[in-house]
Amino acid sequence: MTQDRPLLAVQEALKKCFPVVEEQQGLWQSALRDCQPLLSSLSNLAEQLQAAQNLRFEDVPALRAFPDLKERLRRKQLVAGDIVLDKLGERLAILLKVRDMVSSHVERVFQIYEQHADTVGIDAVLQPSAVSPSVADMLEWLQDIERHYRKSYLKRKYLLSSIQWGDLANIQALPKAWDRISKDEHQDLVQDILLNVSFFLEE
């Protein structure tokens, strides 16, 4: 029984970590869903700004009486755009918190594993049970999850940091660029892993 204790300590750490991942995945997905309409709003605003830039207000008789209308309209659109950017920044901050929360819990699991690695032995680590994947598999899956959040966050942060009001074409293309990031990712990675450990968590 004493020999089982180190293995049980690692398994207990894994059992604490995966529910945290599940909770954080919910927050991650919710933040990503919130971003879609915001990106569409930003794209539409860029389209409106482009249309206003291309329109020669002085050529429209009804608008000649309002010489500063073009600039006032532009300022109003930019203020609206900055509000949307702030909201996107809030969602990005949620993604960062998820990444950091998952990383800290994964790191804790690996610390516990390293403390007990010599006592547990490689055979026990590689051995799955009828309802439980091997500890080695679960540790690898946690690394996969952590890597997924880290890479996904960085790509999205880089995309949003590239937004410049001087480049309206780039802003109009944002929703498609955002979708490309999602398509390049393994969409169901976290959910698939959580499914693989569901029986283990119920033990």
UniProtKB/Swiss-Prot annotation:
Where is this chain primarily localised? nucleus
Give UniProt keywords alphabetically: Cytoplasm, Nucleus, Phosphoprotein, Ribosome biogenesis
PTM comment? Phosphorylated on serines by CK2 kinase.
Q: Name one GO cellular component term.
A: cytosol
The impact of changing S134A is: Abolishes phosphorylation by CK2 kinase
Q: In UniProt terms, what is the effect of altering L69R?
A: Loss of interaction with CINP. No effect on interaction with interaction with AFG2A and AFG2B
Has the keyword Nucleus been applied to this entry?
yes
- Give the residues annotated as coiled coil: none
The observed outcome of changing L63R is:
Loss of interaction with CINP. No effect on interaction with interaction with AFG2A and AFG2B
Under Pfam families, the record lists: CA109-like
UniProt keyword Nucleus present: yes
Places the protein is found: Nucleus; Cytoplasm
Q: Give me any GO biological process, just one.
A: ribosomal large subunit biogenesis
Outcome reported for the amino acid change (mutating L73A): Loss of interaction with CINP. No effect on interaction with interaction with AFG2A and AFG2B
Q: Report the protein's function.
A: Part of the 55LCC heterohexameric ATPase complex which is chromatin-associated and promotes replisome proteostasis to maintain replication fork progression and genome stability. Required for replication fork progression, sister chromatid cohesion, and chromosome stability. The ATPase activity is specifically enhanced by replication fork DNA and is coupled to cysteine protease-dependent cleavage of replisome substrates in response to replication fork damage.
Quaternary arrangement and interactors, per the entry? Part of the 55LCC heterohexameric ATPase complex composed at least of AIRIM, AFG2A, AFG2B and CINP. Does not associate with pre-60S ribosomal particles.
Q: What is the designated name of this protein?
A: AFG2-interacting ribosome maturation factor
Say which species the protein is native to: Homo sapiens
